[in-house]
Amino acid sequence: GKVVSASMSEVTNGWVALVIKAADKKLVCVTQGECPLTAMWAVENSCEQDGLHVDIMSLNANNAAVIRRFVKWAAPSACGTKGTSIGFSDWLGAAGGCIAPLFAKKQVKPVLAEYSAADSVLLKRNFLEAVDAATWGVFETGYKEGYGANAEGLKSEEDIVKALLYGYSMIGLDLSLIHI
């Protein structure tokens, strides 16, 4: 396969990157010595070669969470007070990899993961799938300037906790059921 060089990132005692072979994308981690990530990956295949440990993995929710934790630029971040943020209503999660590079060196930050509780039922898509799609898109392009993740229309404490646990940088509450 071909290594997506923009995704190559240093981790403790090794490197992680996306590899594309035909239409299939895999995550590959190459380490030497002890690496805390090895125990966290959901590994499909692994081998040892010349003192190097190689893990080959699918792009799943578990591995996206590990990437967000150890490759900080691939995780959503707060938009802050500098510049502007723009959302794209990319409810299908297909545009993150295409849109992010357009914002390189700009004072505008893209909101790449957008989750709406109402739309999720129609799309059959949950919190995690939305942020994972943005994570993999950003990781593949190597976009390191930050992006936002928005979860809106949240009605329950459970949904708020999930959004925060999954790394959403902005949440919107639906207070229509609150009685004063």
Walk through the language-model features, giving the residues of each.
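Active-site beta-loop-alpha junctions enriched in small/polar residues
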Residues: 89-91, 115-118, 154-156, 176
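Conserved small/polar residues in nucleotide/adenosyl-binding loops
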Residues: 178-180
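N-terminal active-site wall of soluble small-molecule enzyme domains
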Residues: 118-144, 148-162
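Low-complexity, highly charged intrinsically disordered N-terminal segments
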Residues: 64-67, 90-94, 101
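Catalytic domains of carbohydrate-active enzymes, especially glycoside hydrolases
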Residues: 95-111, 166-170
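N-terminal accessory interaction module
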Residues: 1-68
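Conserved oxyanion/phosphate-binding beta-strand-loop segments in alpha/beta enzyme cores
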Residues: 51-73, 111, 117-128
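Hydrophobic faces of well-ordered beta-strands that scaffold small-molecule active sites
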Residues: 84-88, 110-113, 147-151, 171-173
